[in-house]
């Protein structure tokens, strides 16, 4: 599982021109890719890292500040570009396996009291964000 965390001052995700999830203040935009073979252990690691990493201003975490998280599923994070000119997506989990794990990450963050908003799994989405820093870090579980 890969989670690309970007510190933002605001972010939103739209489907067919309609905003379906947004952060109106500071927080984290989390692009989440699920690999084939991922499970509960990877979910727990990503939830812990997203909630507890001190990546916000003043070395704060989202769990410690109440800042929100916008989670957007993105299978392309599992792409392999090591050969040729076209990425391979073979490492990505199939949608029927990935969706419950994305939902589990969202539920795990909410269980920790983190305000979470999301995109729509599998939809063609437009993601907008205003980066803060910029500060982006990759979590691999």
Question: How would you describe each model-predicted region?
Answer:
Residues 91:
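An anionic oxygen-ligand recognition environment, strongly enriched in 2H phosphoesterase
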Residues 1-88, 99-141:
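N-terminal, polar/charged subdomain of small-to-medium soluble alpha/beta proteins
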Residues 96:
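Short, surface-exposed ligand-recognition loops at beta-strand->loop->(often short) alpha-helix junctions
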């Amino acid at each position: 599982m890969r989670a690309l965390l970007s510190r933002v001052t605001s972010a939103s995700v739209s489907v067919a021109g309609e905003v379906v999830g947004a952060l109106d203040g500071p927080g984290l935009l989390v692009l989440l890719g699920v690999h084939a073979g991922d499970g509960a252990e990877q979910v727990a690691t990503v939830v812990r890292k997203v909630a507890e990493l001190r990546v916000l201003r003043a070395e704060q975490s989202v769990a410690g500040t109440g800042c929100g998280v916008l989670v957007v599923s993105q299978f392309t994070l599992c792409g392999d570009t090591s050969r040729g000119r076209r990425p391979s997506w073979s490492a990505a989990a199939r949608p029927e396996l990935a969706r419950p794990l994305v939902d589990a990450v969202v539920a795990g963050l909410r269980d920790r009291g983190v305000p979470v908003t999301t995109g729509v799994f599998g939809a063609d989405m437009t993601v907008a964000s205003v980066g803060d820093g910029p500060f982006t870090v990759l979590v691999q579980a």
